[in-house]
């Protein structure tokens, strides 16, 4: 019989993380916390429609959480304040309005002054053009920033993993899985593994289980729930 292996993630509360420690010492370490975004924007745009659009996009609630948390913690600075450690932040979005520009575009750069870093520059000929562009490309803009955060997490987990739990998963299910540091093995059976990471004010964990595949009925919602509840 084939066996179905399922991994489930349970996040009780999203917890803040320390500033990312770069894995490459050739550049300065990027500043800031995960999912923190520096927006370099003139006062006129920030207090107008452009600022409203930026806040609506990047501080929108994260879907499916049991409490309201923004996608990004947005910190706005002016061009004058964009110096020193601020310029070394991990996530940066620059807003530029120039009437001489013919179209609205976004440029993406990586590791400009620090590592790991993403710098996005959104520029257009007018506030109206920027607002229109933001409305049409909001998902792509969020995706680029979220992907940068995920790539950093994957890189860190590959370098600083959890050999004990990774070995248990390989032995039990025959699959390789990268597990972050901090997790402990809460339970292990021939077809079940539960790992968790406890914080002072939050709990994070996942479980993996398998059961025999006996046809399409084994993949119905009822079958999945029944196997999970064993």
Feature roles, as predicted:
Residues 1-15:
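Sec-dependent bacterial lipoprotein signal peptides
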Residues 2, 17-230:
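N-terminal targeting sequences that direct proteins away from the cytosol to non-cytosolic compartments
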């Amino acid at each position: 019989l084939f066996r179905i292996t399922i991994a489930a993630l349970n996040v009780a509360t999203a917890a803040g993380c320390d500033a990312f420690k770069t894995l490459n010492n050739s550049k300065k370490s990027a500043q800031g916390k995960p999912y923190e975004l520096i927006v370099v924007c003139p006062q006129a745009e920030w207090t107008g429609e452009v600022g409203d659009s930026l806040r609506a996009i990047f501080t929108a609630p994260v879907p499916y959480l049991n409490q309201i948390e923004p996608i990004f913690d947005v910190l706005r600075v002016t061009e004058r304040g964009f110096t020193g450690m601020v310029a070394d932040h991990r996530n940066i979005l620059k807003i530029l309005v120039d009437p001489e520009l013919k179209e609205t575009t976004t440029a993406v750069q990586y590791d400009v002054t620090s590592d790991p870093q993403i710098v996005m520059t959104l520029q257009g000929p007018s506030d109206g053009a920027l607002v229109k562009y933001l409305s049409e490309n909001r998902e792509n803009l969020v995706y680029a920033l979220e992907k940068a955060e995920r790539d950093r997490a994957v890189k860190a987990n590959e370098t600083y993993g959890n050999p004990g739990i990774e070995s248990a998963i390989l032995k039990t299910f025959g699959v390789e899985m990268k597990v972050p540091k901090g997790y402990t093995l809460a339970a292990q059976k021939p077809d079940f593994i539960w790992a968790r990471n406890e914080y002072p004010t939050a709990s994070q964990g996942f479980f993996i289980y398998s059961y025999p595949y006996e046809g399409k009925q084994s993949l119905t919602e009822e079958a999945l729930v029944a196997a999970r509840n064993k």
